[in-house]
């Protein structure tokens, strides 16, 4: 019998609406997909998130808007609904981003607008026969927008030319745009001094193909433990990713303001789950926050069918990004992305249990009952002794009705997994893959035994698992009809080979903040 370390989450049957995540953003109603236009307002100390939004239905369709939400801490959100809309009902405001034009390079602002709130949106305007790049600007800090009267600002006569990501490049004193020529598998890099006149600098090609590229990003990311940084190019693939449907890849390299050059020929996956797409970072993030971004927590293979009620789709939790050198195997160490979930000051523990040094078969190592929200986190450090009988599990169990979501580790294969095969929502959909997995080298060795770390969050119908400090992640949605959050969370150890060094489980809730 193969042994594995598993976490299982079961839930009571209540009402569909209660499966809404607590911390990950969801629209109040309607359809949502890609995150757009994230930026930080340093005057009001406020994070802004925009998103692809259809307020008229819970499936994708036109007219397509940008929705808008804000947060003080990236965990508690206020939704404002539709913000930028198309000129005609058959058109759409497709993905793009927002920059803070502190120095008024665009000329859109006068001195009455605080430099910290000179907000400019750059987005794809989609019609039946064209995709062109448009600009709009806000005179109230990002709540309402005026469209630039001379739109479009960029048109290459291609119907698959979309998803601009713009940022200020200080060394060359210019704005940079990365944008996808989607079905040519090409990321174009443009430059501008005023956000309205753009010149092509170079093209980047490479990586996993799939059907098309979307939602690129380019940002400088610090390398942990050094004073150095590297540039990271993010590219979304849909459909046809190696994980099935939608996913994100990234490349690490250098950027001189004109050309991105990867350090190697390897395309790295950002997440090994099924529900992580269109990742984007926040512009103007405070230095102490580092590089912050989030993704759409869904997959185009089944996004329109997710069994929620008045709303459909969520974002992931916000994540902080760094780079670190880590082993891919015993012989090769490479620079890789580390992702760590962000919990704002509004997130507190309603309940918490910690235990250490759990050895061998302990079938109720840790158990925590739902007290308020049924939103849980778990943090486990464990070692594996391959000389012992590896049969058994480490698992977390809850509820009635026999449905479950599992996450865990198989010591025989040396891999982590998430298993949503015992959930009935979308069970008949052939693309709602039961199991996803990730391989990572041990976090460290102690007493000649491999040691691993697994941190996870179960938030409504979303599970996000972070392995070995975020060197690999697994993000998956799951749908148990009528869930009202997890009823309890239990860690079990039934394997002689697994020694739990330390464990902590929390029930999380949100408190009011000023």
UniProtKB/Swiss-Prot annotation:
InterPro entries: ConA-like_dom_sf, Glyco_hydro_32, Glyco_hydro_32_C, Glyco_hydro_32_N, Glyco_hydro_beta-prop_sf
Major localization class: secreted
Pfam annotation, one family: Glyco_hydro_32C
Glycosylation sites: 56, 104, 110, 197, 203, 357, 371, 389, 422
EC number of the protein: 3.2.1.80
Protein family: Belongs to the glycosyl hydrolase 32 family.
Name of the protein in its database record: Extracellular exo-inulinase
GO cellular component assignments: extracellular region; fungal-type vacuole
Comment on pH dependence: Optimum pH is 6.0.
Xref: SMART domains: Glyco_32
Entry's Gene Ontology molecular function annotations: fructan beta-fructosidase activity; inulinase activity; sucrose alpha-glucosidase activity
Job of this protein: Exo-inulinase involved in utilization of the plant storage polymer inulin, consisting of fructooligosaccharides with a degree of polymerization (DP) value from 2 to 60. Splits off terminal fructose units successively from the non-reducing end of the inulin molecule.
Induction statement: Expression is up-regulated by inulin and maltose, and repressed by glucose. Ammonium sulfate, ammonium chloride and urea are inhibitory for inulinase synthesis, presumably because of the release of ammonium ions.
Enzyme superclass (EC): hydrolase
GO BP terms: inulin catabolic process; raffinose catabolic process; sucrose catabolic process
Subcellular compartments: Secreted
Residues engaged in binding substrate: 33-34, 52, 60, 95, 162-163, 214, 300
Temperature dependence: Optimum temperature is 60 degrees Celsius.
Domain of life per record: Eukaryota
Naturally occurring in which organism (per UniProt): Meyerozyma guilliermondii (strain ATCC 6260 / CBS 566 / DSM 6381 / JCM 1539 / NBRC 10279 / NRRL Y-324)
Keywords: Carbohydrate metabolism, Glycoprotein, Glycosidase, Hydrolase, Polysaccharide degradation, Secreted, Signal
Signal sequence bounds: 1-18
